[in-house]
Every structure is written in structure tokens, then in C-alpha cells.
Amino acid sequence: SPQIQVYTRHPPENGKPNILNCYVSQFHPPHIEIEMLKNGKKIPEIEMSDLSFSKDWSFYILAHTEFTPTDSDTYSCRVTHVSMKEPKTVNW
């Protein structure tokens, strides 16, 4: 089933704009749904890299969005894939 990593492009500082990445790998077949959430609500505009595959023919993709970290907001990445019975959510 997909491996999910959620991390920032730059060291996070509250109040300083950053990029939040959701890297999803080790999945097959290639169809996958990736959502990024702020306080449990879907972030409407996220960027997606092209789907790529590894030497073992598993797929990987990177979703990312601009965001500004704060103490009060929580961010997560939710992935839906045929290999899992229900969506998997990983918090940042």
C-alpha cells in the first residue's frame, strides 16, 4: 500500500510562507487520489507532479501547496487507493 510522507520544503517557522509536500510512493496500480487538508478541510488548489515510476514499477507522485505555518492550524495529507480499504491520513 502507498507510503506517505508529509514535510516542508524549508525549515518551518510560524508566520513565514513555506511549501508543504505530500510525497506518496510504493503504489500500484497508478490511479490514486491525494488530498491535502487544513484543519480537516480540503485545500482547493494543490499542485501535483507528474506521476513517475521506480525501477520496481511502483509509482510515486508529489503533491504540494503553499502555506504559512501557525501554532493553531493542523495540516494533513489524505490518500485514497484501491490497495487500501479506506483512505489513509498522515498529519504533518
UniProtKB/Swiss-Prot annotation:
Q: Does the keyword S-adenosyl-L-methionine apply?
A: no
Q: Which Gene3D superfamilies match?
A: Immunoglobulins (2.60.40.10)
Sorted alphabetically, which SMART domains does this protein's record hold? IGc1 (SM00407)
A GO biological process this protein is involved in? antigen processing and presentation of peptide antigen via MHC class I
Q: Name one GO cellular component term.
A: MHC class I protein complex
Give a yes or no for keyword Secreted in this entry.
yes
Can you list the disulfide-bonded cysteine pairs?
Answer: 22-77
Give the CDD domains listed for this entry: IgC1_beta2m
Q: Chief subcellular site?
A: secreted
Q: What Pfam families does its record include?
A: C1-set
Domain Ig-like C1-type: from-to ranges = 2-91
Mind listing the UniProt keywords for this protein, alphabetically? Disulfide bond, Immunity, Immunoglobulin domain, MHC I, Secreted
This protein's source sits in the domain of life called Eukaryota
Which residues belong to the signal peptide in this entry?
none
List localization entries: Secreted
Subunit-structure text: Heterodimer of an alpha chain and a beta chain. Beta-2-microglobulin is the beta-chain of major histocompatibility complex class I molecules.
What the entry lists under PANTHER family is as follows: BETA-2-MICROGLOBULIN, MHC CLASS II-RELATED
Q: Which family does it belong to?
A: Belongs to the beta-2-microglobulin family.
Report the protein name in the record: Beta-2-microglobulin
Question: What is the native source organism of this protein?
Answer: Mus caroli (Ryukyu mouse)
